[in-house]
Amino acid sequence: MDNFKHLPEPFRIRVIEPVKRTTREYREEAILKAGMNPFLLDSEDVFIDLLTDSGTGAITQDMQAAMFRGDEAYSGSRSYHALANAVKDIFGYEFTIPTHQGRGAEQIYIPVLIKKREIEKGLDRSKMVALSNYFFDTTQGHTQINCCVAKNVYTEEAFDTGVKADFKGNFDLEKLEEAILEAGPANVPYIVSTITCNSAGGQPVSLANLKAVYEIAKRYDIPVIMDSARFAENAYFIQQREKDYQNWSIEEITRESYKYADGLAMSAKKDAMVQMGGLLCFKDESFLDVYTECRTLCVVQEGFPTYGGLEGGAMERLAVGLYDGMRQDWLAYRINQVEYLVNGLESIGVVCQQAGGHAAFVDAGKLLPHIPADQFPAHALACELYKVAGIRAVEIGSLLLGRDPATGKQHPCPAELLRLTIPRATYTQTHMDFIIEAFGKVKANAANVKGLEFTYEPQVLRHFTARLKEIDA
């Protein structure tokens, strides 16, 4: 298939789901009833759902077939061993705990690593700080509910939508080491390498950067956990952009990347393509004590550690999905679909973050400059987009970032972005064209979009369940 300008999707569509078309009047009433929060809309009222790529996409025929091999034994399931063997083969990690999704892994490993640091290094719980290139929202939430500060040490260009760079998801290595020394190495219970970096726009992290982070962490004996939701997309970007790895396969790059962490926590609902599932894995015997403690917590919080809240068929499907998500032609198609959407939006004057792996990120601050950060311009844009076209998207900005738990003040946000997250193998190029056209209509009326204020504000992860109202001028 060489020398073609346009290549179609590398799959055939066998099952379809009808969707409901609605009127503008209907949608205005629906979003008002949902407290001006797209998370609270009923899915049947959404025409194109770009809220998340987490568990919302299609699966492969091999994944579906694998479900029928499920061993539903409570303990020692054959399906667990199939999953653990896949993890060992792909990532090179010896110890595997399945979880119901990524946050299931987070609620287990975070308190265990804090406790370990306290016992072995004398961590002061009043001074502890965890570090990341950028914490995913639930990782930040679990860090904070364990009374630990979550600090992001990203590069200067990460959130500058006017800058193009190969690896905008990288750690700022100088800031990382400064943050370790400022907190005191003993007070840093873990470092999280997030690949790709979702909050920065699905931007990749280079292998050289992952290696350098790990070297710094080892210097201070700090464990590194790889947030692995989009591990395959990150490997694809490394292959395409990092000179030393252009002739490596996705599988080879993945195995090399995971040398530079001690454990991985994964929402398998992204690159592993399953509707439900997660992983918590550790590399080798040096983390056997952590693995053992995490298994104990798993029994209490997720289920017996050889099923972790998943049925046997789901573990079989995940074992296959880890491989299917690494297919070269699949990844090329997926990344190109995002790039097509970003290029189309920018062609009509809608400024976006550089195309990343799983979503287009619109710079809402530039599209709605009249709305200040504390009135959540990206969330206001999400509501307007739904009213105009029935498209559901999600804010990645001040609303998501939340308040400082100690002071109650709003965290300063580096950018106000609206994420248009593309579910896997679900929407076609025609859908992308419709989204671009919808933004043309939104842009034409942008000056009339109103800011928002809370009518109900949860204390943790407020963006999921908050209720808001428009602010009248």
Swiss-Prot record:
InterPro entries: ArAA_b-elim_lyase/Thr_aldolase, Beta-eliminating_lyase, PyrdxlP-dep_Trfase, PyrdxlP-dep_Trfase_major, PyrdxlP-dep_Trfase_small, TNase, Tryptophanase_CS. SUPFAM superfamilies: PLP-dependent transferases (SSF53383). The modification N6-(pyridoxal phosphate)lysine is found at K270. It comes from the Bacteria. Disulfide bonds: none annotated. Its EC number is 4.1.99.1. It holds the Pfam family Beta_elim_lyase. The keyword Lyase applies. It catalyses: L-tryptophan + H2O = indole + pyruvate + NH4(+). One of its GO terms (molecular function) is tryptophanase activity. Belongs to the beta-eliminating lyase family. This is Tryptophanase. It comes from Vibrio vulnificus (strain YJ016).
